[in-house]
Amino acid sequence: IFEYPIEGLPLGTYCMGVDSINSNESSDRINSLATAYILKRTHDPLGKFQYHIVASYAGRPKLVTEFYELCEMLADMYNAYILPEFNQSFVDHFVNQNKGYVLWDTPQLSIDIKQTAFSSKMASHKKGLNPTPTNQQFGMDLAVTYSKAPIDYIEDRKVMSRVLGVNRIYDYMLLEEMKNYKSKPSSSKGIHDGNFDRLISFYHALILANHLDKYLPMDKFISNKDKKEEPRLQTPA
């Protein structure tokens, strides 16, 4: 945890990206990690951790359900919406816990990523983003833009200097993945040449934050500090 949740911030301030795992046993050939990253959107331009990663997890729990429960607890703790890479078991866990609303609906998001021609597989679910080359490239483009963007370095609520956006990333293992990233020349099964689980979760958080910035600006959200039921969004004026 890089910053604990700030009480009273509007629902939608925190966006969680998730890359889950499919089985309890790790493969000898491919040792994937279960990962989750929480990004805080900007709510105070001169405050700390604006558009920063505030929490992250990467590991291989003995049981897949332990990871699902961890994500559920993090979402409750930060009052966050989740955009996972599509995994039916992950979606089922939240639906069975009556928390399906925490998972952001993806149809409009997919349209934004220029996927207007849905295959039957894509049309069969509304939660989670399919790992298609188009979606992966969109996420990678956001991660690159985020890292290269010039940002103001603020101290005591004063702008002191300008630095690259990558300075907002305090997760060293994510930085290591980004440094060692390799892509495939061309593939119908994805663009990543290797396991980049942290990066995948990170760009899912970015995709969701970018989407909410466009369609649901912070001032349009109901404060959800004392959430006791499914949160609802105010209709934009």
Predicted regions and their residues:
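Short alpha-helix plus adjacent loop in nuclease-associated cores
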Residues: 105-160
